[in-house]
Amino acid sequence: MKFIDEFRDAGLARGIAQAIAREVQPGRPYRFMEFCGGHTHAIARYGLTDLLPANVRMVHGPGCPVCVLPIGRVDQAIALALDAGVVLCSYGDCLRVPASAGGSLRKAKAQGADVRMVYSSRDALTLAQQHPDRQVVFLAIGFETTTPATAVVIQQAAALGLKNFSVLCCHVLTPPAMVGILDAPAPGAVAIDGLVGPAHVSVVIGSRPYEAVAERYRK
């Protein structure tokens, strides 16, 4: 099948590995950070580290926006659901993110909060239309890939005149996250030679947002 078999071509993979081996300097260590949790999963699943030269190391990065969601944001969402009595909705993986004191949105639901799982931002907007007597809050999360969908429902809610729909915005921008990693604890102190950026995000934002990062931290 087109574009499937090519990704599973052992000969092609070995050729790429050999090309990498020819490029690296034997006496120098290399550290590359994959930014996305999907990359980390693929590297582990397919044993890609075994194909790389011994002096090339992959460093696991921040992962997905859900993985790095600050505890304070989860606490805020739980407080809205438990104390303010709103309909708090978000994607399924957000409901399991741990908050302070061992809490989570899923546990808040078990305590009586109206927490609902949705598959899209549009589902959250539909809930607001179906329950005009309730305040519906959508916990929005994701990289630049999901931000447009959140923006669209905000525009749609305004066009419909909905007063009971709001968004708790927890979207994350990729380039600032990269800068945060590379600047900790001080600019240039992190032993990383390159970053493997998230593919879906890069399709959305293009290469220009990365240019400043590449120029500033180039070795």
Predicted segment positions?
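Metallocofactor- and cofactor-centric catalytic cores in central/energy metabolism, strongly enriched
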Residues: 1-133, 147, 158-160, 166-168, ...
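Phosphate/pyrophosphate-binding betaalpha-module
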Residues: 139, 143-209
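Conserved anion/nucleotide-ligand pocket segment
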Residues: 213-219
